[in-house]
């Protein structure tokens, strides 16, 4: 049983009503409920009295160091079996981290801890790592995004990785680790028997100089399945240094996120070698890189190779034009693996979308999700899209948000959505404007077809 309350300011009467439930439910989530330290004594008593509790989430509440301390005291009892604890954005600072080592030692059942958006800093992280290294601590997943960490924190973290073979997920995104810190972290990973599965280092000040270190990590960690290096200035040189590790048989990576990494078509050449060779790679994001049409051509050639089994490709905001769409048409008609294509925020226009629609109208296409938001599609382009909705049997989600169409274009889509042969399940139309009459028709259709969601 779960108690899941979000974005509700809890009155005294409502709080009195909830306290007995907090003492009973296995999962308790009270996110963004306006809780402060004042309520934490009650929470502490309630969780202490609840031996069934396996998950507690108090994210986005101003608990402060005192409030967090009270909650953790309540969890430290012999009957507590909690497995997942989220204290994201709760105002935990260095001053409140002194309780963490004892908490981690006593909660041997705890497997997942979220401390994102707490300004604990390097000193707080050091205290946390003292607890993580204790033999009684069995934590497997740790999230520390936006925690004011620097390179100083990387040595304690590396020490944890060296001794914790069961550690599976580490999120350090949006911390100023920079080149020295990432090098220390990578060395710790290479030296350890840690079976890490997911490493997220978005916006950590990584440069091309770190990519040889990261190459060694992906080469040595067969357990690693997800790597996020988004919003780091890797450049083409960094991608060239990373890819040899990705090509090795020991690398089993499934998901690679490279948003906004200063990659151009030149960098695509190295990535294309990986796509052709690695059947394990299923998700690739290259959003917000200046790939342009030449980069799209190179990617599509690789997607057609038998060795490529990619299922999801994100190329949002990559300066693609209608000239790139014939390349994707070949992929859409021939690929048996690509299920999701995110092309939003590229000026494809009606010409490009009409080209894509020719391919999507062919029998036996397998694409399930297509994102074309902010692609300069007008009412004219909706005619081709409406035909796709009738002809295509695989497409389940279509995003057309923030395009130049209006009521007439939406009505064309609506006519296709009414037909029994249309199998679409979700249509997203944010920031598109139509009359009240069109709105009434859309909502009436949703009532007639409960399996269809129209989000606007």
From Swiss-Prot:
Pfam families: LRR_6, LRR_RI_capping
Keyword Zinc appears in the UniProt entry: no
GO CC term (a single one): nucleus
Sample GO molecular function, one term: ribonuclease inhibitor activity
Keyword annotations of the record: Acetylation, Cytoplasm, Leucine-rich repeat, Nucleus, Phosphoprotein, Repeat
SMART domains: LRR_RI
Modified-residue entries (N-acetylmethionine), positions: 1
Single biological process term from Gene Ontology: tRNA stabilization
Database matches in InterPro entries: Leu-rich_rpt (IPR001611), LRR_dom_sf (IPR032675), LRR_RI_cap (IPR041302), NLRP_innate_immun_reg (IPR050637)
UniProt subcellular location: Cytoplasm; Nucleus
Start and stop residues of the LRR repeats: 15-43, 44-71, 72-100, 101-128, 129-157, 158-185, 186-214, 215-242, 243-271, 272-299, 300-328, 329-356, 357-385, 386-413, 414-442
Highest taxon in the source lineage: Eukaryota
PTM sites of type Phosphoserine: 86
Recorded domain comment: The LRR domain forms a horseshoe-shaped structure that interacts tightly with target RNases via a large protein interaction surface on its interior side.
Binding partners and assembly: Forms high-affinity heterodimers with RNASE1, ANG and RNASE2.
Protein task: Ribonuclease inhibitor which inhibits RNASE1, RNASE2 and angiogenin (ANG). May play a role in redox homeostasis. Required to inhibit the cytotoxic tRNA ribonuclease activity of ANG in the cytoplasm in absence of stress. Relocates to the nucleus in response to stress, relieving inhibition of ANG in the cytoplasm, and inhibiting the angiogenic activity of ANG in the nucleus.
Listed name of the protein: Ribonuclease inhibitor
Gene name tied to this protein: Rnh1
